Amino acid sequence: MESEADYVLALKGNHKHLAEDVKDAFTGRSKEFAYNTLEKDHGRVEERTYTALCSQEVLDESQCDAWKNLSSLIQVDRLVTLSDGTERHEKQYYLSRLPAEGVEKISSYIRGHWGIENRLHWHLDVTFREDHCRARKEYAATNLNTIRKLALAIVSQ
């Protein structure tokens, strides 16, 4: 984080203690900012609630200092309802330099990232038939995925 750019980073299991603290923060009574979206597409309805908290109000100083200019914690609560009535519910957590008050802007960054990821995976599957790959031994699947991404980057230039 050398530059002064804004960031929105997905919080995953590789930061176990921080992930637990962030998750716990959303069960408290801190001041929160929320933004809701509803999308109907491809035979499903997706409801998303983006909730942001000021990081300094819920994390200790050492946790905040570990992330340059950390300003907010974000929870995305996503409920997907399929046309047959089946529901899938998931929560994801993010760290951001953007202020919690800007939760709508933060949501657009998160959705934009999902769009890029979806297009990448679509290309890997359709162009390279990655889902049909039977490589399972040791690091073969990971190595082939890296080669496909490299090939896609070269072709896309």
Which stretches of residues belong to each language-model region?
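Basic, amphipathic alpha-helical segments enriched in Lys/Arg and hydrophobic/aromatic residues
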Residues: S108-Q157
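An anionic, glycine-rich sequence signature occurring as long contiguous blocks
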Residues: A5-R111
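Conserved PLP-enzyme active-site core in the AAT-like
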Residues: M1
